[in-house]
Amino acid sequence: MFAPLLKKLFGSKNERDVKRMAKAVQAINALEPQMVALSDEQLKAKTAEFQQRYAKGETLDQLLPEAFAVVREAGKRVMGMRHFDVQLIGGMTLHDGKIAEMRTGEGKTLVGTLPVYLNALSGKGVHVVTVNDYLARRDANWMRPLYEFLGLSVGVVTPFQPPEDKRAAYAADITYGTNNEFGFDYLRDNMAFSLDDKFQRELNFAVVDEVDSILIDEARTPLIISGQAEDSSELYIKINKLIPRLKRQVEEVEGKPTEEGHYSIDEKTRQVELNEQGHQFIEDLLSQNGLLGEGESLYSAHNLSLLTHVYAALRAHTLFHRNVEYIVQGDQILLIDEHTGRTMPGRRLSEGLHQAIEAKEGLPIQAESQTLASTTFQNYFRLYNKLAGMTGTADTEAFEFRQIYGLDVVVIPTHRPIARKDFNDLVYLTQEEKYAAIITDIKQCQALGRPILVGTASIESSEYVSKLLQEAGIEHKVLNAKYHEKEAEIIAQAGAPGSVTIATNMAGRGTDILLGGNWEVEVAALENPTEEQIAQIKAEWQKRHQQVIEAGGLHVIASERHESRRIDNQLRGRAGRQGDPGSSRFYLSLEDNLMRIFASDRVKNFMKALGMQSGEAIEHRMVTNAIEKAQRKVEGRNFDIRKQLLEFDDVANEQRKVIYHMRNTLLSAEDVGETIKEFREETLSATINQHIPPQSLPEQWDIEGLEAALYSDFAVRLPIQQWLDEDDKLYEETLRSKILEQIVAAYYEKEELAGAEALRAFEKQMLLRVLDDLWKDHLSTMDHLRHGIHLRGYAQKNPKQEYKRESFTLFQELLDSIKRDTIRVLSHVQVRREDPAEEEARLRREAEELAKRMQFQHAEAPSMEQAVAGEEEELPEGPAPVVPLEPVRNEQKIGRNEPCPCGSGKKYKHCHGQLD
């Protein structure tokens, strides 16, 4: 009630933030004359001065005005570009660890230089994160002269980079790379066999470009490093042949089936379910083909993997379509990013789904994989001490940024007012009518000499529009996942007079469309251009630029609405950069996916009430509101799925932190002898307790079992029964001490034979190997637990609570297994006198061989949707309030007497800290 009045009196929080930073801008501007007066050498020397002042105790906030003024002056001298006042505000926003929303063409890349330079002065490194390798290399090469002028080093991390190059890139003051590469390197570092093999140092400060794409769109898909598992290619091929015989159950609006079938599809959640008839039918087919035993059920425990294969094949046939969700290139399935329209080489779907699609398309089936290490972007980026981001569209997701990452969004004012006209949506009855209207609009704009950008949601629709334009005799360029190698070239000239460019979603994001085309690309195409040629190209471009401005600027046409308003806003934002004129229009039909699934009934009834005829369009605010309501509903659902993924991964993340902390402690330890001693005593105590319960009578003792267990665990044969027969006074406590003495003595004999140094090195390497093998198996067990946990909802149990409880039990078992298996291996193995360096080199060679066989997946997470479906009654209509999660600090130390972070209630030293 009072919010509008308070906002009117005091301004919005965003306005107050901008006003506060505007005062700091005045201080930076006041320093400009001083900086202009400095020679190049004096300006360069400022970096060393700032570093010394920081070392003596000045904070980065205190250095900010001078540092920003230095970067602004260096930008003028090195690149001929001066930071605008609004760009300084953007730089301060990023330094504060917030998200800066800046419109297309406002110079986000240049803005990033300000906080990156300032934070690099600390010597702890800064990571600049981009969405693809092309942008990482482009931005690094573009800004490198500026940073190097100021005495800072720049590195770029890329896939398949030689280890020494990657290490050098991470050691640089500023490191550019993609979100995937930073995440995978973090996982690889935690699989290293020595500290020298690690790449990353402390995760200090990250500036994430296109932050919405990385932290929102990519948040549902975990990063996975996997190795090959068993080969099931024949099974995929056999089941693939059976799926086309299943029929879909078609339903009316009232929910009654019009045609009996075997499965139903829920397009809202992208789930497919077999019905009772479907289960019986597929069981009969599997039995006939020898895949299921006579009279056996598909739901028997030993047939569950077969059921997984059936569902994977069913999803591949019904939910994944060629040229929409993926393309076939050679003998590979390349997934398409639904948000950018780009292919994602190397990314594979999990749970056998990728293999099922390969079988569907008749391609060679690659072996299934086993998870070796995994994390999510949500948990990886929260490891940084400070996180900031830039994007053209973040305000619609401000709630999620705040709740999940603790990041505020600040909308930065534009340098010049936006002159773009956003027309109301036009809604048609059919897609055919919609596309006809789009072609008419293109012809009209082209006649005026305006450049046109047509945004489509899939390769299929982009090729359909292309076909219609060919039939109409209109010259055009197509930019989709099939032709992505021409992306920069096509986008560069998309602003030429009368040019028509078709792009799937936001392909080309990160490259501005300049009105009149890009004269720099024309110059770059010439070999050794002269000053006269460059001047002529500039003059011709200036004419074209003016011609396009007078015609009305770039016109953006969208062929349908995306699930997210943010993606729609990104497409609109291609027009009207830096105050240029432009316009945008969305063309929709009731047959579009979003309209058909979420909004069609209300709009269809409205159109019928108006008596709409074929070919007519409706343009009304009520229709636009209905569509936006549908989008908000989808956004709310997607937010809940991401939130569910985070809540589930947070459980695994606590365990991951404990294991990785333990691993790093082992790597940095010179000697793990004390740890092995503790393991030996605890394992022995557990073994004896199993056969001689504490405070029990001798009649209850299982001496024969104890002798066998001691040989199994410690490779020592002890005549315990003989001891007891010979000594009546050998009680429980004295017996325990005697057994321990014998086991320790046997181990010391081994040490004398092998040599203390060799055994210490072997202990360390073996402990690492046991830890890695058991952690890998634990990840697989956790995957299976997570995929089936939603079924607990049917037993009136909370799946999340059950997952937390059972995963804690599994983790306790993992810790016990690490101790027991390490002692068992060390007791049984014969250690040769070998140079520890040779042993480490051998293990490193084995690790390198493993690395060659690794697959790096950024896989889908359908199980989270199932988890959501299992708790559907709990989900609110829109985004639900959640408790803000504190960023996880990379160097955080947990006190041994503090409560364990896993939530068990025990002290850390008696729980997950007992292996440190």
Curated annotation (Swiss-Prot):
Subcellular location: Cell inner membrane; Cytoplasm
Pfam families (UniProt xref): P-loop_SecA, SEC-C, SecA_DEAD, SecA_PP_bind, SecA_SW
Membrane topology, as annotated: Peripheral membrane protein
Region listing for Disordered, in residue ranges: 857-916
EC number: 7.4.2.8
Gene3D superfamilies xrefs: Helical scaffold and wing domains of SecA, P-loop containing nucleotide triphosphate hydrolases, SecA, preprotein cross-linking domain
Reaction catalysis annotation: ATP + H2O + cellular proteinSide 1 = ADP + phosphate + cellular proteinSide 2
GO biological process terms on file: intracellular protein transmembrane transport; protein import; protein targeting; protein transport by the Sec complex
CDD domains for the chain: DEXDc_SecA, SF2_C_secA
Cofactor(s) annotated in UniProt: Zn(2+)
Residues that, per the record, bind Zn(2+): C900, C902, C911, H912
Residues annotated for ATP binding in this entry: Q87, G105, E106, G107, K108, T109, D512
NCBIfam families registered for this protein in UniProt: PRK12904.1 (NF009538), secA (TIGR00963)
HAMAP family to which the protein is assigned, alphabetical: SecA
Function of the molecule: Part of the Sec protein translocase complex. Interacts with the SecYEG preprotein conducting channel. Has a central role in coupling the hydrolysis of ATP to the transfer of proteins into and across the cell membrane, serving both as a receptor for the preprotein-SecB complex and as an ATP-driven molecular motor driving the stepwise translocation of polypeptide chains across the membrane.
Protein name, per record: Protein translocase subunit SecA
Organism of derivation: Pseudomonas aeruginosa (strain ATCC 15692 / DSM 22644 / CIP 104116 / JCM 14847 / LMG 12228 / 1C / PRS 101 / PAO1)
